[in-house]
Amino acid sequence: MKNNFFNKPIGNINLKPVSNSEVSSQILYGEKFTILLKKKKWFKIKTNYDGYTGYIKRNNYLKKFKPTYKIYKLKSRIFKKKGNKFLQTKNFLYLGSGISVIDKNKKFFKFESNKWLKKRDVKQIDHYEKNFIKILKLFLNIKYLWGGKTSRGIDCSALIQIYF
């Protein structure tokens, strides 16, 4: 099954269909993948962008989704709206995550039911940053993590992929 999209801020792609398995890579919100095999609580997937294969939990995906913007900050805090106020949550989306904007105001984009991001943290999906050094500098002092793709930890291949 092609054209599925990951719908959590970040997830591990495990080598085996168990939570404590070795990680082959990570998958970001809005990232497209193909389902290769269905197990009880797991899908074996192949990411469309970089071709990594492994297992993710079954409930972490959307079938219908068209990213129109992407996160262009190391991590972008998710806000909830209560009345006219925007309240910080403890959750983030990470650099490169794709979102579909469903509502907006002066300072925020809504991308899911009562989930908002600051406009300044996102750019059009087709935006291409010409300054490679600018992107690399975002990751100064970020620890190395096998398979990592975020500010929580990154590996060598992800550092290059994030630019492209």
Where are these regions (language model features)?
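Boundary regions of SH3-family modules and the immediately adjacent low-complexity/disordered segments
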Residues: 1-2, 25, 29-34, 39-40, ...
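Extended, low-hydrophobicity, Ser/Thr/Pro/Gly-biased non-transmembrane segments
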Residues: 5-7, 15-23, 32
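Active-site nucleophilic cysteine motif
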Residues: 136, 150-164
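Second-shell loop/turn segments in exported
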Residues: 143-150
